Amino acid sequence: MKALDEPPYLTVGTDVSAKYRGAFCEAKIKTAKRLVKVKVTFRHDSSTVEVQDDHIKGPLKVGAIVEVKNLDGAYQEAVINKLTDASWYTVVFDDGDEKTLRRSSLCLKGERHFAESETLDQLPLTNPEHFGTPVIGKKTNRGRRSNHIPEEESSSSSSDDDEEERKQTDELLGKVVCVDYVSLEKKKAMWFPALVVCPDCSDEIAVKKDNILVRSFKDGKFTSVPRKDVHEITSDTVPKPDAVLKQAFDQALEFHKSRAIPANWKTELKEDSSSSEAEEEEEEEDDEKEKEDNSSEEEEEIEPFPEERENFLQQLYKFMEDRGTPINKRPVLGYRNLNLFKLFRLVHKLGGFDNIESGAVWKQVYQDLGIPVLNSAAGYNVKCAYKKYLYGFEEYCRSANIDFQMALPEKVLNKPCKDCENKEVKVKEESETEIKEVNVEDSKNVMPKEETPAEDESERKENIKPSLGSKKSLLECIPAQSDEEKEAHITKLEENENLEDKDGGRARTEEAFSTEVDGEEEQARSGDETNKEEDEDDEEIEEEEEEDEEEDEDEDDDDNNEEEEFECYPPGMKVQVRYGRGKNQKMYEASIKDSDVEGGEALYLVHYCGWNVRYDEWIKADKIVRPADKNVPKIKHRKKIKNKLDKEKDRDEKYSPKNCKLRRLSKSPFQSNPSPEMVSKLDLADAKNSDTAHIKSIEITSILNGLQASESSAEDSEQEDERCTQDVDNIGKDESKVEHSTHSRNELISKEEQSSPSLLEENKVHTDLVIAKTVSKSPERLRKDMEAISEDTDFEEEDEITKKRKDVKKDTTDKALKPQTKRGKRRYCSADECLQTGSPGKKEDRTKSKEPLCTENSSNSSSDEDEEEKSKAKMTPTKKYNGLEEKRKSLRTTSFYSGFSEVAEKRIKLLNNSDERLQNNRAKDRKDVWSSIQGQWPKKTLKELFSDSDTEAAASPPHPAPDEGAVEESLQTVAEEESCSPIMELEKPLPASVDNKPIEEKPLEVSDRKTEFPSSGSNSVLNTPPTTPESPSSVTITEASQQQSSVTVSVPLPPNQEEVRSIKSETDSTIEVDSVVGELQDLQSEGNSSPAGFDASVSSSSSNQPEPDNPEKACTGQKRVKDTQGVGSSSKKQKRSHKATVVNNKKKGKGTNSSDSEELSAGESVTKTQTIKSVPTGMKTHNSKSPARVQSPGKGGRNGDKDPDLKEPSNRLPKVYKWSFQTSDLENMTSAERISILQEKLQEIRKHYLSLKSEVASIDRRRKRLKKKERESAATSSSSSSPSSSSITAAVMLTLAEPSMSSASQNGMSVECR
């Protein structure tokens, strides 16, 4: 750097400090190539010229007067304005290195390289962190300039000229001018019309001193032309245009008159073109609408002048293109597409770019754009974006007097999403209501179509398709609809049901199909997470899950609609998010990009402010601490979850009515058109697509549990075996088997109908009662069931299974959460349905086992009477049918929870809540109900019922032996319980006579059960053929009497098994029962031959969740039923139930609603599998002997609350169990005491269960390995898993499960808990 006194150039040998690798080092100039440039001003004309020093005479010093050699060789006086040393110096450093440098890299040796005040002592080091930033201002004379003073003087003197030029330019701004220029090609003067614009329009084009910037009308290009070549065009001075310029000239005149923009100054905004950002921005704004929920971006509704936006963007993009800075990419700001027109208007409203000086104003502009403020640079970023894209255009428009409609969007920019969502929800609700009404009408129309089987098939298909199409919308609407709307729809459904009853069972069947389809979708939704969790425990479940996921995709819309109902943070909102774990946990500011609801939990896709988008992730709502803006209230997402749970509960309720409806359909068809209608219905279902037929038949049969249970045991076992293979390999096999079973069932049904029309009539009566109850209780459920049925037709068996599981889970959740009144309703429905379906099943059993029809008729009539009594009880305000049933519900729920030890605590909480609710209702209704029950039933029976710990006593009649007397007592007890709770009825009738006991005993039991359990009891008795060859006939009787005892386990279970049953915890028994029921359901669904048995077991295992449990059980159950065909079936079921329990526990942790239902379904399915595997040997033999009997175990499981227990031990005697207690004692207690006692018992059961669980886990692993091998073999050969391996596993399971079986005998309790 040169000081003022430095020489103009340096000479050789001068000691200098030379810059070497960034530092100044001592050196000496070795050679110099001198070149000094001198800028001088001649005195005579004040002109300035730059010459070399060899043309100058005089001292080379700034301000000196010298003589300068002119171009012509003459010398003239001039003053040196500036000296520039451009010499090249070669220097030698101390170490001998040489380097050639410019003067700027040299300074005289000894020169201080810092200012006087720049010592560290004097530096004001106010900010040590910024030590590198210079505190002292930079030197003014940087570079090679020796002095700036003369230059400043000259520039200041010339500022006047600049002002004059600016004035002239300002006068021309916006004027239409003609520009003269010389064409080099044609070598003649040319001109073109142009518009004078502000030089600030273009940064790319340098506008010189005497030039102005114009935009040509000819090609739209911007050019800088000399001021002297521009002439304004006026009406007087109009040059004659060439032919080439005619159009441009016309456009110029048009612009001069009306400011009409020429076409070539606009660009067509095409999607493909690089400058087609207008439409793209519109799309971006649409995206912004969706993302931000801010309707301010909706151009169609909000933009006051939508055409103006297009006009603006067309001109803007063309302008940017013509000036050489095309917009090739969408403008983005804050990870959002930038609405340039809106930004332009916002800045215009504030007076233009130059008038905005405060960064706070720019930040406000940023917020007004609707973009979430990510960081403190928001204002700067929007300012830069404006300068880049719009500043030049703003100057251009100002100078050219081009105006736009600058009205801003009419609505508030940051509109709360809730309003929008509410509007959308309202609209959706309205549309949904209309859709539901349409569907109801469709179902009505379907009834007349059912007159002929062929027409039924074709029309059904047509009806099912539209119902499927509107399924999603219906499901979406259901949650959104208010209770009043739901009630209205329920009444409509009831009316439809009545019409269907009149017309025949066909219409009901169709409704059931559609209901099942809807139910399945609902199940798929609630069960998505459940299925995922079940992956870990069961490969079979994994296959089902895959199909569920496919269904889930269809259900995404439904979920989205549900989300709208939930209170969610709107996209774009900034929130504080917890990130990391433990000590590393930090709080980050994030903006919400999207939200979703999964499994009752709100999920958010968040973008961490200031972080790359690759860190965007989905987080749970609990990770959000609070909104970044403290003024925004924090949303309680628990409310959302509750809402979702409620919705799921509603769906579950709907689903259980669906089951009732389906069962009713089957019964009513039998009643009105006994054999022909049922056959036609089944045939129609079979005639439908193979998948549809299988699925529908399976679900219908599972719903009609009795029907499926009545199928031949041989068919069921075969179908189960096939199912195992199919689950492993393909669902298609299951479908074919299901069709086969459906046909066989149809035949059986027709036979039964012919043999016992009176039974059908009784069943019809029961069905009507149950249906009426169900309809009144849960019309929505019926609706969903109908829709689910139609869906089932489309979905494969696995879908059905997963859906069933979902239903089970939903029911479980509903049970826990919903008042017991709802549970009671469900139980009635399920019980009635079981009874209804059970009667057909019984008919089949009769025909197969040649049992006397009179016994069935008597049992059906008795069951009908019981159902009537139950319906009366239901009609009473004490929906809880009895304190007993309510208690049972609570007990079932608790036992169920304890069954899944891991989830036990959560479930206990749920149970406690539900128990409290139920108990509140019970306290009111118990007296009336109890008095009515006492009047209806003998004291002896009541004692038995309640001594079993409510349901336990009923569930396990006298344990001692399957004596007929004991069976009858148990049946009576069950009947009493059933009168209290239709679910109990269902469960009890199912087990009827499982084993090969004398037919006489069976009819007796059946008749007793019929009286006790109207139709379901009789059905189950008739349907239950000897479960396993091992089980003696006496055991069968016992099972029939116990009906709740595990039918799967051969009645002749050894005393050890009985002991095990007694020992087994209620939870385990519930699980086992559930699994048995699931297996039975699976068999039923596969064979579609014994729906009654399955339904009974399902209803008994979980009275509230009969249908959901049945579906899941049907899935795993089918596979397991194949295995279960031996005595080992119960043991295998136990194994599976334990597995399921583990899985279910995990699931429980994830979601309360889904977890409960999942646990039930999983546990049940596991138990079923275990039982099935142990049973296979016996079952197979029985199948050959009496196929109906195989299904009877399922029925047994169904038969009553005891079903779970009965299912596994197949013959649980009415033993007093370790965890049993008197119902009367419970009634005397307060709700709190009752809960505490139940909790204590559950804890005991849980401890016992945990001891069994570890043993079962190892067996399960072994079973899984065996199953994999079996699947591999099954893939090649359609044969099911080898009976030997299944039987072995079953034997091991039985050994382990003995205690669990004993607990299962406590089914009454477990049923109540459920």
Swiss-Prot record:
Q: Where is the composition biased (Basic and acidic residues)?
A: 439-464, 486-511, 643-656, 722-754, 778-787, 808-817, 841-853, 997-1012, 1058-1067, 1198-1210
List compositional bias (Basic residues) regions by residue number.
1132-1150
ARID domain location, by residue? 306-398
What Gene Ontology terms for biological process does this UniProt record contain? Answer: chromatin organization; establishment of Sertoli cell barrier; genomic imprinting; negative regulation of cell migration; negative regulation of stem cell population maintenance; negative regulation of transcription by RNA polymerase II; negative regulation of transforming growth factor beta receptor signaling pathway; positive regulation of stem cell population maintenance
* Composition-biased stretches (Polar residues): 1013-1023, 1164-1186
User: Could you tell me which residue ranges the Tudor-knot domain spans?
Assistant: 572-624
Its localization reads: Nucleus
Tissue expr: Expressed in Sertoli cells of the testis.
Signal peptide interval? none
Q: What happens when the gene is disrupted?
A: Embryonic lethal. Lethality occurs between embryonic day E3.5 and E7.5. Heterozygous males are fully fertile. Double knockouts of ARID4B heterozygotes with ARID4A homozygotes show various hematological abnormalities, which are more severe than the ARID4A phenotype alone. Hematopoietic stem cell (HSC) and common myeloid progenitor (CMP) counts in bone marrow and spleen are increased. Lymphocyte numbers in spleen are significantly reduced. In peripheral blood, red blood cell counts and lymphocyte counts are reduced.
Q: Where is this cross-link: Glycyl lysine isopeptide (Lys-Gly) (interchain with G-Cter in SUMO2)?
A: 428, 461, 751
Q: Which SUPFAM superfamilies match?
A: ARID-like, Chromo domain-like, Tudor/PWWP/MBT
Keyword presence, Transcription: yes
* InterPro entries assigned to the protein according to its UniProt record, in alphabetical order: ARID/SWI1_ChromRemod, ARID4A/B_PWWP, ARID4B_ARID/BRIGHT, ARID_dom, ARID_dom_sf, Chromo-like_dom_sf, Tudor, Tudor-knot
GO MF assignments = DNA binding
What ranges does the record list as Acidic residues composition bias?
Answer: 277-305, 531-567, 788-800
- Domain-related comment: The C-terminus mediates interaction with mSin3A corepressor complex.
Q: Specify the protein name.
A: AT-rich interactive domain-containing protein 4B
Q: Which organism is it from?
A: Mus musculus
